[in-house]
Amino acid sequence: MAAKQPPPLMKKHSQTDLVSRLKTRKILGVGGEDDDGEVHRSKISQVLGNEIKFAVREPLGLRVWQFLSAMLFSSVAIMALALPDQLYDAVFDGAEVTSKTPIRLYGGALLSISLIMWNALYTAEKVIIRWTLLTEACYFGVQSLVVTATLAETGLMSLGTLLLLASRLLFVIVSIYYYYQVGRKPKKV
């Protein structure tokens, strides 16, 4: 009883069979575009992601601006907490302080914002950097409106307060500029 030999198996060359390769890539989910329009070359890059996508392309001078902002917020906060009379006098040029409590509360709020600014200086996360820049722009914008309204009520106008307003508006512009620069999508390489 001779056992009959099975016919030799035909090996399929899937590397050369384009339809088979396409089906395999489709099953693996490789080669198609993701939500951001990126085409992944391998399953590993699809699972792990493309690290370029997560890297923040920092605009020139961003970290210097963050450092200066954190220093400004900290120094004004400390001055408002420790020397409320002098801070009020510097802003409103000779007007009398009726109560130190609101100025000290302002200093406490500024100190809290400055802690956020200091922490944002050491992060690489785009969202955190953008939120701190937006917070800064909103703060300076609101401060400009409050100082303008106070000057309109009191009628006190001096060179110091005009310089303060001009500097605050400049800070708003710079913060918004960096906010949009950090939010830009990186160019495909």
Curated annotation (Swiss-Prot):
Keywords: Membrane, Phosphoprotein, Transmembrane, Transmembrane helix. It is a multi-pass membrane protein. It holds the Pfam family p53-inducible11. One of its GO terms (cellular component) is membrane. Residues 85-108, 152-155 are extracellular. It comes from Rattus norvegicus (Rat). The modification Phosphoserine is found at S14. InterPro entries: TP53I11. Residues 1-63, 130, 177-189 are cytoplasmic. PANTHER family: TUMOR PROTEIN P53-INDUCIBLE PROTEIN 11. Disulfide bonds: none annotated. It is found in: Membrane. Signal peptide: none annotated. This is Tumor protein p53-inducible protein 11. The chain crosses the membrane at residues 64-84, 109-129, 131-151, 156-176. It comes from the Eukaryota.
